[in-house]
């Protein structure tokens, strides 16, 4: 699934902007502070949230445009529109209307084509196929300290959309999932020493590709429970990595995790499809990594 066109009108500080014929692999939005980069990503997240909602229920609603999102001073409605590479388009809008006594707002959506797309995705998943990953990593994404006691995470294909577009990315769910999958893998290895979990292999492949010096990420049980990773020849706790290392590593591993959840039918889940939105992709990164990350992300 790929985005072809985006049209945004009267959304926050944006009066009218169109992104036409977007690159199918990678699009970088560059601008000075206050230019509207985050607003563009937030608008796209609102639009994609309706697709996720309609996968769950035919009458479900996605994120709404708040009255505060309508451009100040505009008498025209706020309009967000998206078109995919398969010519499927949908629109979410909100306008201000006035009465004599008070001000009211009205909303309008055009979701007919998107509803059909949502139903196709659900039907494909029910036949054992995969679903597209839709994910937004906002600038507020954080790497919370890895909890000492991780809870087992029961996973199904629709968990790929948990907190996907809400802006609440703290990566805790990644560590819980990794612990759960590693437990399953360890149980299988007792019967078959050559067994490796294909979803964990997807994460390991990403780590080796992005971080050649990193390997063997695992949950250490003794002397106390902690997520550890081998950096060079030294095994260190995840919490001891630099903020840039933690942020970068968690980002690419979480993308790989979601691809694995979304594509249980693929031998290589990294061949799955989706739309990933990342605000300030170079956040906390060393200048060398800042120069590399955009190109490397296209390899996932």
Residue ranges of predicted features:
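Switch/communication elements of ASCE P-loop NTPase nucleotide-binding domains
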Residues: 1-59, 224-300
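Extended helical coiled-coil dimerization/tether regions that scaffold
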Residues: 85, 162-271
């Amino acid at each position: 699934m790929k985005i072809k066109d985006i049209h945004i009108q009267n959304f926050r500080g944006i009066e009218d902007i169109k992104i036409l014929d977007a690159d199918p692999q990678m699009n970088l939005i560059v601008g000075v502070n206050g230019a509207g980069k985050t607003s563009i990503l937030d608008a796209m997240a609102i639009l994609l949230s309706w697709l996720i909602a309609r996968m769950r229920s035919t009458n479900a609603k996605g994120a709404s445009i708040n009255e505060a999102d309508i451009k100040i001073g505009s008498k025209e409605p706020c309009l967000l529109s998206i078109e995919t590479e398969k010519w499927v388009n949908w629109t979410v809008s909100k306008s201000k209307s006035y009465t004599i006594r008070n001000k009211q707002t009205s909303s309008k959506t055009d979701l007919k084509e998107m509803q059909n797309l949502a139903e196709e995705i659900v039907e494909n998943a029910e036949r054992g196929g995969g679903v597209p990953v839709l994910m937004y990593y906002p600038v507020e994404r954080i790497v919370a300290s890895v909890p000492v006691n991780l809870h087992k995470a029961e996973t199904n294909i629709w968990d790929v959309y948990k907190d996907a577009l809400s802006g609440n990315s703290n990566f805790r769910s990644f560590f819980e999932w990794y612990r759960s999958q590693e437990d399953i893998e360890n149980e299988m290895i007792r019967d078959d020493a050559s067994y490796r979990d294909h979803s964990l292999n997807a994460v390991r492949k990403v780590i080796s590709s992005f971080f050649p010096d990193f390997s063997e990420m695992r949950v250490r049980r003794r002397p106390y429970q902690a997520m550890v990773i081998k950096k060079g020849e030294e095994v260190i706790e995840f919490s001891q990595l630099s903020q840039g290392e933690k942020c970068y590593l968690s980002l690419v591993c979480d993308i790989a995790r979601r691809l694995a959840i979304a594509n249980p039918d693929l031998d290589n889940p990294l061949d799955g499809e989706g739309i990933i939105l990342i605000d300030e992709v170079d956040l906390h990164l060393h200048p060398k990594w800042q120069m590399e990350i955009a190109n490397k992300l296209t390899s996932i």
